[in-house]
Amino acid sequence: MESLVLVREEHPEIHHNLTELRRLSFEKMLDKFGYDTNLSHRLIEKFLHFRHEVTLYPDVEGCLRFLQGKYKIASLTNGNANVMRLEIGKYFDVHLSSEEVGVKKPDRMMFHQVSRSLEIPHQRILHVGDNPVDDVQGAVDAGLQAIWINRSQNPWPLDSTDPHEIRDLSELIEFLS
């Protein structure tokens, strides 16, 4: 983790590309311990393979089934997991990562790219996310509607008005019904 922080500081121009930041972090660690730095490419391949072995919350697939056909669904991430590589990828119309867009949430450009990709005005998009700054405030600042999914029941940490909050995705279904 420490090397990832150092790489971010050394390469601010790729702050949005978590995969390359992580690869460079692996490279830095390999070099530090006297290993061939070219191994960083194989390490990132392995990392990304295991990155996509996820366990979903029990409410995820049921919610996606409910939404499918009623709404266009997009995945928007600052990370390097691609929802289209998962079994639930079939429910999504669009997947966008900060690596593809060139900026990361909370930058408005991320949210506006979703609007363009879905061909829906950004004012008509509801963004559901778990990060108060990157997801909720970022979406609101970009002109989208936002819901905070707060599974841990934390207090709202920002000075801005509390957003609509849900504890799990069954509450999203209730909200939309």
Regions found by a protein language model. Give the residues of each.
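N-terminal helical cap/lid subdomain that shapes the substrate entry/recognition surface
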Residues: M1-P58
